[in-house]
Amino acid sequence: MLQPTDTTPRQPVLTCGPMPHTLWDISPPIHSGSPVFPGDTPYSQQWVASIGPTCPVNVSALTLSPHVGAHADAPLHYDPAGQAVGELDLTPFIGPCRVIHALGCGPLVRPEHLAHALPPAPDRTRHSHGWHPLPPRVLVRVYARMPQTAFDTALPALAPETVELLAELGVLLVGTDSASIDPADSQPLPSHQTIRRHGLRVLENLLLDNVPEGDCELIALPLKLMSADASPV
């Protein structure tokens, strides 16, 4: 959920702008056709109880990878000794945020692709180009239209030096509308490992199709899943 700086909801949401606020639900719909990483568990639903003469309610059972749809990766996802998602401090997942567009930038989003929305070196704390100092959360939009019917094997990813720069600038959380911050066929996962080294948090599979560049309030709280490697947000 995104809000234009000034409010507070729940689900991935962004809010931005002057009153009345614009509110963006940045979670894609989740259903049996939702794209999943090749080999991962897709969404499925079974009814285990149905309203009838002897049952007053409908109850379903869900099966899915926690990486289906908009989600937060836990350190456990890329570090065998890392924290599970239910153990994480929620602070990075709520608060001031900047959305930066890096559309059509190729397979890797590099620092120069974000430079137009970052404070200039050497003093990156000053206002510049109409931007305020960088908030501690950054969402990078890489798609004009996020794929919602098939997995993108050529997904745009973040170069590790881009994550490194954002960490140096004090960012606590990095998010994207791509399915991963690393290329789909990456084995060493250099950007995830940069996230790990700096203790950052990461959001993936966000729906940013209609979200403009600018500063917002982010609300993307993971579930308290005490042994999981990720959580829907």
Predicted regions and their residues:
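Active-/binding-site microenvironments in catalytic and ligand-binding cores
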Residues: 2-233
